[in-house]
Amino acid sequence: MKNIMVRDEVYEKLQKMKKGRESFSDVILRLIEGRKKRGIEILERYAGSLSDSELEKIVMEERRKFRVRSFDS
């Protein structure tokens, strides 16, 4: 088990998202898994109906939306 720190506003939002006796870890995992499923659903919806160049364009647009946070050592 690991400890993480989040801003107060993030804590409050996670607290509101909890269902029943769900832990914060459960909430975060649910959010992550939901995001993965949406990505898979999008790919399945377009599978076979787009040309390779159209699919590549969509993939590149989605990659640009993805933010990576860098950490100073």
UniProtKB/Swiss-Prot annotation:
Organism expressing this protein natively: Archaeoglobus fulgidus (strain ATCC 49558 / DSM 4304 / JCM 9628 / NBRC 100126 / VC-16)
One Pfam family of this chain: VAPB_antitox
InterPro entries (UniProt xref): Put_antitoxin (IPR003847)
Function statement: Possibly the antitoxin component of a type II toxin-antitoxin (TA) system. Its cognate toxin is VapC16 (Potential).
Residue intervals passing through the bilayer: none
Family listed: Belongs to the UPF0330 family.
Record has Signal as a keyword: no
Organism placement in taxonomy: Archaea, Methanobacteriati, Methanobacteriota, Archaeoglobi, Archaeoglobales
HAMAP family assigned: UPF0330 (MF_00794)
Keyword Metal-binding: no
Keywords for the protein's UniProt record, in alphabetical order: Toxin-antitoxin system
Protein name: Putative antitoxin VapB16
